[in-house]
């Protein structure tokens, strides 16, 4: 049997972030083979991962990347249980690697099974993180924007490391004019989407989710009816309020945060003159970390009781 040295144990710990005794046992079980021991730890971690799968993963990172030619951009959200993990170098590196892979594999379903540039399957990469870091994790979502002529701009807010943050926005501008102008304005619009008090729900009114429109109409109808106005006037009130709401949540109709006297639509018209050709917003993507994920509220008393009964 190969000698299990302290240096070998240390190397395996650095490679996997597993505990010292676990690393020693893994090396003993695999005759000192470092790679086999790492795989053994991962296999051991698989059973742990299953136990963690029901724990809410609402923290983590949003990773963003734009291709070298500036015509494609991607955002991914990699979740974990605590914000502490977001500062882990291995976690940040994994998020960046997944984002790079997502530039090629757009659909989330195919991304899970895709291989990174290093040859590791994305699902295996995430499972390995669960095993070594010890928290439930998941690749929650991924979205890519691409233009044939134009530029895709990226803005990351509350940055946690290179290419990773708590909020990310992509904006795609279509146009054959001055690309430097498109890139600059695209980034400014991305900053607008990140910072405006009312995050846009759609690019145009026609792109709004019919369910969201129906819900808003129901709310405004109820409010108008309770006002005691005649039905005809109430109906006009509803239509007026729906139009106002659409102006608030449609990107092109929103006042530009850097110049509230100008709408995004007017900014695009101005940009076309600067760029020397027609410009249009092809699309935008906004990922805010953990949005829509129900976070588990810890019951401290129950936790103490559980620890007491277990001791």
UniProtKB/Swiss-Prot annotation:
What PROSITE patterns does the database record attribute to this sequence? EF_TS_1, EF_TS_2
CDD domains registered for this protein in UniProt: UBA_EF-Ts
Q: Give the range the annotation lists for the signal sequence.
A: none
Q: Which InterPro entries match?
A: EF-Ts_dimer_sf, Transl_elong_EFTs/EF1B, Transl_elong_EFTs/EF1B_dimer, Transl_elong_Ts_CS, UBA-like_sf
Annotated GO CC locations: cytoplasm
**Where are the stretches annotated Involved in Mg(2+) ion dislocation from EF-Tu?**
82-85
Using the UniProt record, give the first listed, main subcellular location. cytoplasm
Keyword field: Cytoplasm, Elongation factor, Protein biosynthesis
UniProt key word Cytoplasm: yes
Compartments where located: Cytoplasm
Entry-linked SUPFAM superfamilies: Elongation factor Ts (EF-Ts), dimerisation domain, UBA-like
GO MF assignments = translation elongation factor activity
Q: Which PANTHER family match?
A: ELONGATION FACTOR TS, ELONGATION FACTOR TS, MITOCHONDRIAL
Question: Which family is this sequence assigned to?
Answer: Belongs to the EF-Ts family.
Q: What does this protein do?
A: Associates with the EF-Tu.GDP complex and induces the exchange of GDP to GTP. It remains bound to the aminoacyl-tRNA.EF-Tu.GTP complex up to the GTP hydrolysis stage on the ribosome.
Q: What is this protein called?
A: Elongation factor Ts
Gene that produces this protein:
tsf
């Amino acid at each position: 049997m190969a000698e299990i040295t302290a240096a070998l144990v240390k190397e395996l710990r650095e490679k996997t972030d597993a505990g010292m005794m676990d690393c020693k046992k893994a090396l003993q079980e695999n005759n000192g083979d470092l790679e086999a021991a790492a795989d053994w730890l991962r296999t051991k971690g698989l059973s742990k991962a299953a136990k963690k799968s029901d724990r809410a993963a609402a923290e983590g990172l949003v990773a963003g990347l734009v291709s070298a030619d500036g015509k494609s951009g991607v955002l991914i959200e990699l979740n974990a249980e605590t914000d502490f993990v977001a500062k882990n170098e291995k976690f940040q590196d994994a998020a960046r690697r997944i984002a790079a892979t997502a530039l090629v594999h757009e659909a989330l379903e195919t991304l899970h099974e895709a291989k990174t540039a290093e040859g590791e399957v994305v699902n295996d990469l995430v499972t390995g993180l669960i095993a070594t870091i010890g928290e439930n994790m998941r690749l929650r979502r991924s979205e890519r924007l691409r233009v044939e002529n134009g530029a895709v701009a990226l803005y990351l807010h509350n940055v946690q490391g290179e290419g990773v943050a708590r909020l990310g926005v992509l904006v795609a501008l279509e146009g054959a004019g001055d690309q430097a102008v498109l890139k600059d304005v695209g980034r400014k619009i991305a900053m607008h989407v990140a910072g405006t008090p009312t995050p846009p729900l759609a690019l145009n009114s026609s792109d709004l989710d019919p369910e969201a429109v129906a819900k808003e109409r129901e709310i405004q109808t109820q409010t108008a009816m309770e006002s005691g106005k005649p039905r005809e006037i109430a109906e006009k009130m509803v239509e007026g309020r729906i139009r106002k709401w659409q102006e608030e949540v449609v990107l092109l109709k929103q006042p530009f945060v850097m110049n509230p006297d100008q709408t995004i639509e007017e900014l695009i018209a101005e940009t076309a003159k600067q760029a020397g050709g027609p410009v249009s917003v092809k699309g935008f993507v906004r990922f805010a970390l953990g949005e829509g994920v129900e976070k588990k509220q810890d019951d401290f008393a129950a936790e103490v009781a559980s620890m007491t009964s277990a001791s």
